[in-house]
Design a protein with these regions (language model features):
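Glycine-aromatic micro-motifs
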Residues: 1-145
Length: 145
């Protein structure tokens, strides 16, 4: 069976809403990781994140790496919300894997959460689990800024 590595940065992560879609596709968890410092992250209506590559203006984003059977990759992509796609993601060690990325239009008028460092940290800050000053820089943003 052929497989590929897939970096996920939102609701596909372990224990979150869409993780059963990864499991149903036959995926197995490999490790927690981070991107290179060239991505920005937005909260899309507080339902899921969108990560965009922004060379020279980004930060590291926490994510998980999963091994996914090629036959299940389309199933995972089809279960993602509109505006998210599979593309190449640069990891902090310089390696490149497939990953879930957002399209710029999706981020217009949405809250930028890059300073949180990842979706889990944003969700925790929003719930007050990390104190009132967590992710202070959260603000509406533009994908082309």
């Amino acid at each position: 069976m052929q497989t590929t590595l897939l970096a996920v940065n939102g609701t596909l992560m372990r224990g979150l809403e869409l993780n059963p879609n990864l499991l149903a596709a036959g995926a197995t968890f490999v490790r927690e990781d981070q991107t290179e410092a060239c991505y920005r992250l937005w909260s899309i209506d507080d339902r899921h994140p969108a990560m965009l590559r922004t060379p020279g203006a980004g930060a590291r984003v926490a994510l998980e790496v999963w091994e996914v059977p090629l036959a299940g990759l389309a199933q995972v992509l089809l279960s993602e919300p509109p505006g998210l796609a599979i593309g190449k993601v640069l990891l902090r060690d310089g390696s490149v894997v497939l990953g879930v990325l957002g399209e710029p239009f999706l981020c217009e008028g949405q809250r930028e959460i890059t300073e949180c460092g990842g979706w889990r940290a944003y969700v925790a800050a929003r719930a007050g689990e990390q104190g009132p000053h967590a992710c202070v820089g959260m603000r509406p943003g533009r994908a082309d800024a």
